[in-house]
């Protein structure tokens, strides 16, 4: 672990291996090896995918866990649990996978977890998690949450929160290093001022490398809409507006994620969309829109509210990996 901690201060040479040789234990189906599990999954564009969740997710939210894994089982999507995690938001502290299959482990030290004893205690140690699960990534000392990285081929979207999280770096130098590590053109989008995480995956998602979907701009703040429109123009992106809603109040959970549909889970040919069922919801509109955007994919819905109240949704709580064949 100490060696791993020291490695966080610089990049080590890239290490790429087929995922089925990395031996992450599949806790859901302990009799199966990871290789056996992946072989049973359908091949999409030469790769297979598997969904990982923190073992704490099953422990803390057993009903929601069952709802999600029942959907995955229904569509023959493999899943497994990650050991040695301290919170359920595995997207943020697990490595980011590039289009070629490399795993890049960024520093996980977000500002929103600092100066709060409760949050500090729940911050997962990336070195411990990687070691416990047999993961051998390339380490970087760039401070960046996985939920703030969206990759499609040779393009990556990251919000400008990455700059304030790395104050000692020049913006252009940081972009260049991210481009090198992620093997992609870096597209910086504006973070939402009222989102304490500043993550890209709560605002937009890739449909393909030239098209993104995102929260309906007509309902967004003017400052964000204008900056986002500039990004769309600069990078020649098509933006598809998806319904969302503000206004749900819960005094015990002021930073909830209820109302955000774009933080869905996408794996293989399946998209799992959260629906909320609360007053003022736009569940039906959002599901219809997502089905229109992805006519060739299966779209399932799920009640994820008990997790959403804690500030995240499906993409936040899953880590989806490709195994290249």
What is the meaning of each model-derived region?
Residues 4-6, 10-325:
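The feature marks the mature, well-folded catalytic cores of soluble enzymes
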């Amino acid at each position: 672990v100490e060696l791993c901690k020291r490695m966080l201060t610089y990049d080590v040479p890239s290490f790429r291996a087929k995922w089925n040789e990395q031996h992450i234990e599949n806790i859901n189906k302990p009799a199966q090896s990871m290789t056996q599990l992946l072989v049973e999954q359908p091949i999409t564009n030469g790769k297979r995918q598997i969904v990982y969740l923190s073992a704490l997710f099953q422990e803390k939210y057993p009903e929601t866990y069952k709802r999600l894994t029942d959907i995955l089982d229904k569509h023959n999507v493999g899943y497994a649990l990650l050991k040695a995690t301290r919170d359920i938001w595995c997207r943020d502290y697990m490595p980011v996978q590039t289009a070629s299959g490399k795993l890049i482990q960024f520093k996980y030290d977000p500002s929103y977890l600092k100066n709060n004893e409760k949050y500090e205690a729940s911050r997962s140690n990336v070195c411990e998690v990687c070691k416990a699960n047999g993961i051998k990534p390339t380490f970087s000392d760039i401070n960046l949450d996985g939920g703030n990285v969206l990759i499609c081929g040779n393009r990556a979207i990251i919000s400008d929160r990455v700059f304030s999280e790395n104050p000692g770096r020049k913006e252009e130098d940081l972009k260049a290093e991210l481009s090198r590590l992620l093997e992609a053109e870096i597209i910086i989008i504006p973070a939402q001022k009222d989102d304490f995480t500043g993550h890209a995956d709560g605002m937009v998602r890739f449909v393909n490398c030239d098209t993104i979907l995102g929260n309906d701009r007509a309902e967004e703040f003017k400052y964000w809409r204008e900056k986002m429109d500039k990004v769309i123009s600069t990078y020649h992106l098509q933006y598809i507006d998806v319904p969302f809603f503000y206004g749900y109040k819960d005094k015990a959970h002021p930073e909830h994620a209820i109302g955000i549909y774009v933080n869905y889970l996408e794996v293989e040919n399946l998209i799992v969309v959260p629906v909320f069922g609360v007053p003022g919801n736009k569940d039906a509109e959002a599901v219809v829109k997502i089905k229109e955007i992805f006519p060739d994919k299966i779209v399932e819905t799920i009640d994820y509210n008990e997790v959403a109240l804690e500030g995240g949704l499906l993409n936040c709580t899953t880590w989806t990996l490709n195994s290249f064949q």
